[in-house]
UniProtKB/Swiss-Prot annotation:
One GO MF term: tRNA pseudouridine(13) synthase activity
Annotated active site: D89
Similarity remark: Belongs to the pseudouridine synthase TruD family.
PROSITE patterns: TRUD, UPF0024
Keywords associated with the record: Isomerase, tRNA processing
Disulfide bond residue pairs: none
Organism of derivation: Saccharolobus solfataricus (strain ATCC 35092 / DSM 1617 / JCM 11322 / P2)
TRUD domain span: 160-377
Biological role: Could be responsible for synthesis of pseudouridine from uracil-13 in transfer RNAs.
HAMAP family per the UniProt record, alphabetical: TruD
EC numbers for this chain: 5.4.99.27
Name of the protein in question: Probable tRNA pseudouridine synthase D
Record keyword Isomerase present: yes
The gene coding this protein: truD
Annotated catalysed reactions: uridine(13) in tRNA = pseudouridine(13) in tRNA
Length: 377
């Protein structure tokens, strides 16, 4: 089966099981998609802190809010820079540990609740938290659940799937983060700026589409008045462009770290490479230790990598963005993800499983359900 056009646009050109057809299944978001950080092979909420230490550790449970907005809110509540282990899905119910450095004036909050997250103090720690993976529980709305069970049973016999970098890295509703990264690396500040603020997608709300159209038409004053506060990135960039009349200086003020856009472009290159090597890799016995390296230097590429780089127009020093003091490194990542504790509840039509840090549940859903990823992301 040929993957969906969104998959192709994100570099995911193949499935592992080529003969499976599309299933008409959806997931109710955020309630049907739960993610719990796994610390020392236990759920985050079971983490036991010490009575004292260098860091105060909290359990952050959030829903319907993106990672950076949630962290920004938590920092205001705790009056401190907040550290975290991983970036969790915005359109899900997620639980993870966050921690802050202690100082003499620090006043700790036992519990805090807002409309989109709950923060609960768990204890102290002086050592690095051992993030062993993420636990997923996903409820499907589907009539052909018997086929889902069959596919899961087949995957359990060989619990490895391609470790594609999932939709969240590129934007689930506007999958263009990697393109923004590409234009940043080309130093086309204007194109990167307008990709962030304009180019509306039909999956967005009418209000958002109308605002993006205002910016496209050059009506910045009306657009900046109309942008809801939750769109922090768009509002900040537009305000700073109006202030400095410079796309570069506007991008320098980015609420979202510029490095995330560049990482997304590297992720796209990884997906392309894995897609084109997948038939070869599927036949290898050792899927546990197989690593892929996406180098920053053309001369370190193999033939497949060189072909991709030539197609993309990647030149010498392409991965150095000195204007933002960013130098990317080689991207090294496992070729396959191991799916642990894969279980099915036929009564509730729920599947649960554990993935290593940095692996994406939506890639398992993609393999099982096929078709338009907007149904399950």
């Amino acid at each position: 089966m040929t993957p969906h056009e969104i998959d192709i646009a994100l570099g995911m050109e193949k499935y592992y099981y080529e003969d499976w057809n599309e299933l008409d299944g959806t997931i109710e978001r955020p309630n049907g998609f739960k993610v719990i950080e796994e610390i020392d092979f236990k759920p985050a909420q079971d983490w036991k802190g010490e009575t004292k230490g260098k860091y105060a550790v909290f359990l952050l449970t959030k829903w319907g809010i993106d990672h950076f907005s949630a962290i920004s809110e938590v920092q205001k509540v705790l009056h401190s820079k907040v550290n975290y282990i991983g970036i969790k899905d915005a359109n899900a119910i997620t639980s993870q540990l966050v921690y802050i450095p202690l100082n003499e004036k620090q006043e700790l909050i036992e519990k805090y609740q807002s409309r989109s997250f709950i923060l609960k103090f768990l204890g102290f720690s002086s050592k690095k938290l051992n993030h062993t993976g993420n636990i997923f529980e996903i409820s499907l709305s589907i009539s052909d659940f018997d086929i889902v069970i069959e596919r899961i049973e087949q995957i359990k016999k060989n619990p490895y799937l391609p470790a594609f970098i999932g939709y969240q890295r590129f934007g689930t509703r506007r999958p263009i983060t990697h393109l923004i990264g590409k234009y940043l690396l080309r130093r086309d500040w204007e194109k990167a700026f307008y990709l962030i603020l304009t180019y509306p997608f039909l999956s967005e709300s009418k209000e958002t589409i109308d605002i993006r159209k205002l910016i496209m038409e050059g009506d910045f004053k009306e657009a900046v008045r109309s942008i809801p506060s939750k769109f922090k990135q768009e509002k900040l960039l537009l305000k700073n462009y109006m202030r400095f009349n410079s796309y570069y200086l506007a991008l320098k003020s980015s609420f979202i770290p510029i490095s995330l856009y560049l990482d997304a472009y590297q992720s796209y290159l990884f997906n392309l490479y894995l897609s084109r090597k997948l038939d070869e890799y599927k036949n290898l016995n050792d899927k546990v230790n197989l690593l892929i390296r996406i180098p920053i230097y053309f001369n370190n590429c193999d033939d497949v990598c060189k072909e991709i780089y030539l197609d993309e127009g990647i030149e010498r020093n392409f991965f150095k963005l000195q204007e933002f003091k960013i130098s990317l490194r080689d991207l090294v990542r496992k070729a396959f993800m191991n799916i642990r504790d894969l279980k099915v509840n036929e009564e509730t039509k729920t599947i649960s499983f554990v993935l290593e840090r940095g692996m994406y549940a939506t890639i398992l859903l993609r393999e099982i359900l096929r078709g338009d990823p907007r149904k399950f992301t």
